[in-house]
Amino acid sequence: DDMISQIESLKIDVYEENIRRQRAELQYMKLQANPHFYINCLNVIHNLSMMGKNDLLQQMTTYLGNHLRYTMEGSALDTLEKEMDCVENYLRIQQLRFPDSIVCEMEVTQDVRSVLAPPLLIQTFAENTVKYQVTAGEITHIWIKVHRTEENPHVVEIEIRDDGEGYPQSVLDCLEKNQKIFDKRGEHFGIRNVSQRLWLLYHDAAKLICYNDKETGGACTKIYLPDDIVENKQK
C-alpha cells in the first residue's frame, strides 16, 4: 500500500511539474511575442513629444498603457472579446504611426466573444501586416472575422487577411515543414510563437493555416480552435 501511495504521489508530482513547465513556457513565449512593438511605441512617443503634439501623445500613452495591462495579466488564456479589444487598441497605436494608412474591418459574432484563446493570438498577425506591408501614404486593408464553423458549432474560426504582397514562399514552406520561419527579412518569431502556444494548449485540436489569398494576393491566416478548453489552464 505504501509503495502504491508513493507511486501515485510521484505521478501527481510529475503531472504538476509538467503543468508548471507548460505555464512557464506559455508565459515566456507570451512575453516574447512582440518586443519590437514596444520599441516602436517609444519612438512614436519621443517623436510626438518633440513635435509638441500633446493630444496625440496622451492618446498614445493611454493606448500603450491598455496594451501593457493586457499583456501583463499573466493568463495563458483570455476571452476573444478581450483579445479583439487588444487588437483594436493595437491598431489605434499603429494608426498614430501611419496616419490614413491602415483600414481594418472586424466581424465578430456575439456567440464567440466569451470563448477562451491565447492572448495576442490575433494581434500577432495584425502586427505582421503592419510590420511587412504597411507603408506611410499608402492604404493597407486588414479584415478580421471570428465565428463558429458551419461544420462544427464547437469550433471557432479566426480569419485574418490583408491586401499586401502576401507571405513569402519561404515562410509558407517553413510552416508546412514545421521549421523555424526565416526569410530575407529575418526570423518570423511571432508566427512560430503562435504555433507553439497552440500546440501546448490544444495539441491536435487546433489548426493554424497560412496562405496567400487568390483574389487580393495578400496574406491570409486561419486559426481553428475548440470552444471547450478546460478553464483551469487559464490560471
For every predicted segment, state its role.
Residues 1-210, 218-220:
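Two-component histidine phosphotransfer core
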Residues 210-235:
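C-terminal end segment of the histidine kinase catalytic
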